[in-house]
Amino acid sequence: MKQIYLDNGATSFPKAPGVGQAMKDYIEKVGVNVNRSSYRATAEAALSTLTVREDLCRLFGAGEDPSYAIFTSGVTMSLNMIMKGALHPGDHLIISGMEHNAVARPATQLEAAGVAVSIAPCDGDGVLRLEEFEKLITPKTRLVVMQYASNVSGTIQPMGEIGAICRRHGVLLAVDSAQAAGHFAFDMQKLQIDALCFTGHKGLLGPSGIGGFVMNEAMNKALTPLIAGGTGSMSASLEMPPTLPDRCLLYT
């Protein structure tokens, strides 16, 4: 009996043609760390990594500097890095009532740590009520985190209007694109998104365990990196390198 897979909101299947072969080829023919030495295979690995960063910036309309594309284990890690790296006790965070637990649970942890959290209401279709959302913004509002699209309701949020409101008030906007990336085109700069968090295993048709975020300089300045360790750069220093992408260490 032929099986028809309908759970693509959880993870895509089958993956895009060539994904499995590309992974196999990399493991068998390259398979080394980036930035750890100067022999040919490490140069090939570095070039592959740089190329993916450039592709991500083009795909998401993030500008031309690939160092602002940071690799993580997926959208959950990316959202945690942004939310917990940008917010401090006394700050104010706004999320919507439609958020996935990848946003709602970090928000709950941050609230317990002294960050004020507001939940912006949505209408019966799950669309953000823009006027009520804007009224929640205060002088202490530092970050807004919103999902772009929902795999529960099918709602696509009016991200351009949300971005315009945030920019008008000088508030950073981070977007959970888990259910949007790969499904439809969008431009971070035009939408005034400061950080776009993505995962590889849904609409981008890649494997599980990969993802990241692409950000602008405003978000970079706001972030305190949460993870420290070896980067293959400035190894004599006990401080993390100040430059991107090594500053935001995960899978650099």
Regions found by a protein language model. Name each.
Residues M1-L250:
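Pyridoxal 5′-phosphate
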